[in-house]
Design a protein with these regions (language model features):
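Acidic, mature catalytic/reactive cores of soluble proteins
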Residues: 1-548
Length: 548
């Protein structure tokens, strides 16, 4: 991420995603160690040490904050808990990183020097530790309050797109505001499951966090009031924390987080939907450094960015009808089969210095209109999640086809960081797309995923993805056991036309928990199976419509 061959903050969390599928041993400790890179102000260390859990203070006086960094830990943590059922991870404790940067990189702590150390302390000089839940809340709540003039989360130094780096004053990332809204809803969901499993009614949190838990629509509507709440919190813990903890009702906390998530999604639906002259629509993803909406049908042509579509789809902001319009618009303005699928953006036709350096690249190179594998895969993932399997498959297949076409891509098979305007694969070793591609094929296309430790089978395979025997199968590890899962589509139905009729495990028909389009194999049933063999699951698909 930083041009020096080292690992960046996002890498830590995306590597864990892949490991959870390929080699899950040790991931729990890795997660705990990674959380120690979070600061108490919700930002995080950006220089990663050579050892696991080692973070280095930035000595270059560069106080750059990537506003998306708080998103990724929750995505990985949720995936881990769903795969394992290990809700107790939420109550495990980790330290907080400390250096001279405070107030989310806007001020310097003049009282800090290296003799203080790199771990946050309380006023009593004791190392501050908080639960994983507390770390997640701080990352997502501080972001919720750090808004620009249009009440979306500020872009700051950049988001996932590192080249959106010239709008630190007035820039806003609507794209990742959606992601944070989704995270707040997901934390609420995990809290509900935690309460149900443990029987606990309260959680212990840093006393200062209470100010971030005000629940009031009038507050949410006001940029000024939000920034005041954030500043109060940042001031309260800018050098040391109080060291005090408070007990918070899980039920009230869950409700609080849902209200924030719902408010943010509704705000985006209401204000950020744009249309072209033919009434086809998509979401605006950004505001530039003049405070202007970036996307839409402008005097210089249509401006559309893929990132701004991925997260409203994935988080649930976009309605099904809006998704239909987004896919139509993306196919029209972003899709180019010759270069590997969905470009990151349309050609803005200007060097837009009030948004980022990306517009200084020639169109089709790097972040300016290349097919960026990571976001193209996440677009597919989001579409699959919402039941748009055909559209999701189109993005994945385009990347695969381009990678395999050596005459054009000039790369060994695999996923590069991006395909340029000539369709050539670039930076084969710099990609988080591989983790997400594997994740999407297994958990969405084949539909084998965890849900707080249960195994969910929810295939979203297209008719043409079954072989001549009408079968599609995969092998994987889940719950410390090896599995081969085979779907039988004897009636030759397409996704949306079939549902699960029968499930057998090692030749025995089982009573699965049925839903219209998925089967649930409970964790307690899985635990009774031996760990020494590859367990065979056969799933029979039969006529039955899925309603989107």
């Amino acid at each position: 991420d930083y041009g020096k061959g080292g690992r960046g903050w996002r890498d830590l969390w995306q590597d864990c995603l892949a490991l959870l599928i390929m080699n899950p041993d040790g991931v729990r400790q890795m997660l705990l160690d990674n959380f120690a890179g979070v600061r108490v102000d919700g930002s995080n260390a950006t220089i990663i040490g050579s050892k696991q859990g080692e973070f280095v203070a930035d000595r270059n006086h560069i106080t750059r904050v990537w506003m998306d960094h708080g998103v990724w830990p929750m995505i990985t943590t949720k995936f881990y808990i769903d795969q394992t059922g290990d809700l107790e991870l939420l109550e495990k404790e980790a330290a907080y990183f400390k250096d001279k940067q405070i107030a989310r990189g806007t001020r310097t702590d003049t009282l800090w020097d290296e003799s203080y150390g790199y771990w946050q302390k309380t006023k009593r000089g004791v190392r501050e530790e908080g639960t994983i839940l507390e770390h997640l809340l701080l990352q997502n709540l501080t972001a919720f309050y750090e808004v620009g003039e249009h009440n979306n989360i500020r872009l700051r130094g950049a988001d996932w797109n590192d080249a959106l780096d010239m709008a630190s004053e007035k820039g806003e990332s609507v794209a990742f505001s959606n992601a944070y809204a989704g995270n707040l809803a997901d934390i609420a969901e995990l809290l509900e499951a935690y309460r149900k499993k443990t029987g606990k009614e309260t959680v212990s949190l840093l006393a200062e966090i209470v100010s971030l838990l005000e629940d009031n629509p009038a507050l949410y509507d006001s940029v000024e009031k939000k920034l005041h709440v954030l500043e109060e919190y940042l001031h309260a813990c800018e050098h040391d924390t109080s060291g005090e903890k408070v007990e918070i009702s899980i039920e009230k906390l869950t409700e609080n987080l849902r209200h924030k998530s719902e408010w943010l999604m509704e705000h985006i639906r209401k204000n950020e939907w744009v249309k072209d002259s033919e009434e086809s629509g998509w979401f605006n993803g950004y505001y530039d450094n003049h405070g202007r909406q970036v996307e839409g049908d402008t005097k210089t042509g249509v401006r559309m960015m893929l990132t701004g579509q991925v997260f409203p789809i994935m988080a649930g902001t976009a309605t099904d009808e809006q998704i239909r319009q987004i896919t139509k618009s993306a196919d029209r303005y972003l899709y180019d089969e010759k270069v590997g699928g969905y470009r990151l953006n349309t050609d803005f036709g200007e060097v837009k210095t009030d948004l980022g350096r990306m517009f200084g690249f020639s169109y089709g190179d790097k972040e300016n209109g290349a097919v960026f594998s990571h976001m193209a895969v996440m677009y597919a993932n989001a579409l699959y999640k919402r039941g748009f399997a055909k559209e999701g498959c189109k993005s994945l297949h385009a990347l695969y086809r381009q990678s395999a076409n050596f005459e054009v891509s000039h790369i060994y098979p695999g996923i590069p960081e991006y395909f340029n305007g000539r369709g050539r694969g670039m930076y084969h070793y710099l990609t988080g797309a591989a983790s997400w591609y594997m994740l999407t094929v297994i958990t969405e296309m084949f539909g084998v995923r965890g849900q707080v430790g249960d195994m969910i089978l929810e295939p979203k395979l297209l008719k043409e993805q079954f072989d001549e025997e009408k079968k599609a199968s995969l092998t994987l590890q889940f719950a410390d056991k090896n599995w081969k899962i085979t779907y039988l589509n004897c009636e030759d139905k397409d996704y949306g036309e079939y549902q699960i009729a029968d499930v057998t495990v090692d030749g025995e028909k089982i009573n699965f928990v049925p839903k219209q389009h998925e089967a649930i194999l409970p964790k307690n049933m899985i635990e009774k199976l031996s760990g020494n063999e590859t367990h065979q699951i056969e799933v029979v698909l039969a006529q039955g419509n899925i309603t989107l």
